[in-house]
Amino acid sequence: MRVGAEYQARIPDFEPGATKYTDKDNGGMLVWSPYHNIPDAKLDEYIAIAKEKHGYNVEQALGMLFWHKHNIEKSLADLPNFTPFPDEWTVEDKVLFEQAFSFHGKSFHRIQQMLPDKTIASLVKYYYSWKKTRSRTSLMDRQARKLANRNNQGDSDDDVEEPHPMDGNDSDYDPKKEAKKEGNNEQPVQTSKIGLGRREYQSLQHRHHSQRSKCRPPKGMYLTQEDVIAVSCSPNAANTILRRLDMELISLKRQVQNAKQVNSALKQKMEGGIEEFKPPESNQKINARWTTEEQLLAVQGAKHSDHSVFRPFTSSTGICSSSHRSHSNFKSATPVTASSTSCCSCSPPSASAAPTTGAIYSAKANPKSASPTAHPPS
């Protein structure tokens, strides 16, 4: 034993005015102190900006304002420089967590994919607080769970077993009732697991989960009772059905490929345009003035052609119309009767047009001397 004055504690003298704890002993940090010069409306606006744009909660936003000595402009400028710790759960976060938990169970890594701003520790912490309050408040979930258990028990014999106390199921029932059920069903479950390996025991545990007892196919895949019966009727039936489905899939892919090729060929044809399919446009213009060569051709055609070939002959020149050509020819020659000045639709000119032919021929041989007798129309 350590006995003596040197082993005793030194007790200081009593001082009535001294405080028990000094400022140095206080390890806490002041994060907010109200300032009377800031109006409440302006403070609420600052908190709203910090929450909506930067994800701060009320305590973090006020702490930033207190750090800058109640200067709102400096606090707003400094808000983007820090990433707040998302510890506050909004109504949207709670709804997303419940939906993610119904899909993935206690797989918090998958739940975090739906709530990326929450850490795993925050998810676990909220899960246990939510689990405690859910059994007291969620009466609708409790009734739905009971009805689901009854339906599962009526559908198959595999789901008749009650939940085991060691399977970690998160039940919404009353803990006292659960304890009674566990005590009553403990012995039959233990006897049924004799001789089972570890894997068989784990598979048996998974069957106790009422929500996970039904194995659903992946998204986009649908199973019917007829298909399941057809597959299970014989050992080779599954391979036969799958081979047939593969052939149908290959044929559908070929049809799609052929349709793509036809569409690409049509697109290439459309890109070429319709210029090659347009009829050629004639650049010749109709001229009302007659040259000497045209007059000679018209007279020769009228002399050597009958009424049936007069129209194609007049269209062979390609410059003047037939009506204008016949009228201008006989008008420029010697005077003739009205019957001789017919167009292409009338009878061919008579013998009275013979002097005109001679005059035109003489005009071609000697233009100077023939100018009084025949001249082209003006």
UniProtKB/Swiss-Prot annotation:
Assigned protein family: Belongs to the CoREST family.
Write out the annotated subcellular location. Nucleus
What start-end ranges are recorded for coiled-coil regions in this protein?
238-273
* Domain of life where this protein originates: Eukaryota
Using the record's annotation, list all stretches that form the ELM2 domain.
1-83
Q: Mind telling me which InterPro entries this protein's record contains?
A: ELM2_dom, Homeodomain-like_sf, REST_helical, SANT/Myb, SANT_dom, Trans_reg/Corepressor
Pfam families on file: ELM2 (PF01448), Myb_DNA-binding (PF00249), REST_helical (PF20878)
What is the source species?
Answer: Gallus gallus
Disulfide linkage: none
Quote the SUPFAM superfamilies the UniProt record gives: Homeodomain-like
Entry protein name:
REST corepressor 3
What does it do? May act as a component of a corepressor complex that represses transcription.
Q: Which N-terminal residues, if any, form the signal peptide? A: none
What gene name is given for the protein in this entry? RCOR3
